[in-house]
């Protein structure tokens, strides 16, 4: 299975197989957005899920991720049916021994927030904006995702799969 991760300025952070990443977004939609993607955290479940985020959108992404982490910290992991969200126990990098959903997805929060920090630092230092997006981290697909024009990412309709799930 190909790995998916965060692609940003000076950053390639592997999150895990596509099923893990998809599970994260499905969990946000199911537990926090009442099944309606983008209704509460559009910067995460719409933009990060399938599009590119520009420098001006990173502050909102950071706030939303912190809010999701706080809400996930109140959801016990013992009632979380990972199989229902498409996760295979034999092919996952999720921290399945966590006590809460925040624990299970802690690597995701760290990787994405670190990428936001790197993007901010890169912009300050070089006055250049590199979009933050999700994509494959394995060659050769990584090369295609990094070089894919931003307008292709941003033209994905809400009902279409992101590139990393195709």
Pin down the residues of each PLM region:
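Acidic (Asp/Glu-rich) sequence patches and key acidic residues
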Residues: 1-166
